[in-house]
Amino acid sequence: MRQGMILGENGEKMSKSRGNVINPDDIVREIGADAFRVYEMFMGAFDQAIPWSTQGARGCYRFLDRVWKLQNLLTEEEELSEALKASVHGTIKKVSEDYEKMKFNTAIAAMMSLVNEIYARGSVTRGELRALLLLLNPAAPHITEEIWQQQALSDQPIYRSQWPSYDEKAMEQQETEIAVQICGKIKMKLMVPSSYGKEETERFVLENDAVKALIAGCLLYTSPRPRD
């Protein structure tokens, strides 16, 4: 349950007289219950009044679609790959702590970042997919259970499986935390390889699903340099 208020897309309180009421049944029919749940958890802190964004909700649908298509990249390897070991353990820690603190928006953002890393690598092990699905299950129970069963990731349902644990030593990697600021406000933080330069960092941030959802419908403008 949200403690804050979901406003209409125009930023005003929803009411029939204003014509800005969002019917959840219509949203579920369009993008499904899982995407609806994920967006409600991702759209912002639970104690804040936040305007509804149809584009943002569709962005969460696209995120879950990418999770579904990870099955096309699945290998037979049961363990974590060396390339993603640090990221997976870091994501487990981040999501676990954020769930405990009810910071669901940043937990979802962390999982979106992990999915981006998996696609950048081009493959996902069974161990990596298993960890991701366990983390995502509280937010998207239907699609995660479906993938879990299709890929036979365990002999029991996902909701009865043990929550993943993380290893602090495995998280040691040369990364830098950067703050993503939109319209003058810090919206989220991302871990970026320390070796990245300015252009690589910008590309990494703009290709992140969480950032895409936050800037959906926004016009990005870079002011020209002043003339000498």
Predicted features along the sequence, with ranges:
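A short, contiguous, amphipathic alpha-helix enriched in charged residues
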Residues: 195-214
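Catalytic phosphate-handling regions of large nucleic-acid enzymes and associated NTPases
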Residues: 6-7
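Generic structural signal for well-ordered beta-strand positions
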Residues: 14-15, 187
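Conserved small/polar residues in nucleotide/adenosyl-binding loops
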Residues: 221-228
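Helix-rich, typically C-terminal accessory recognition domains appended to large enzymatic cores
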Residues: 26-197
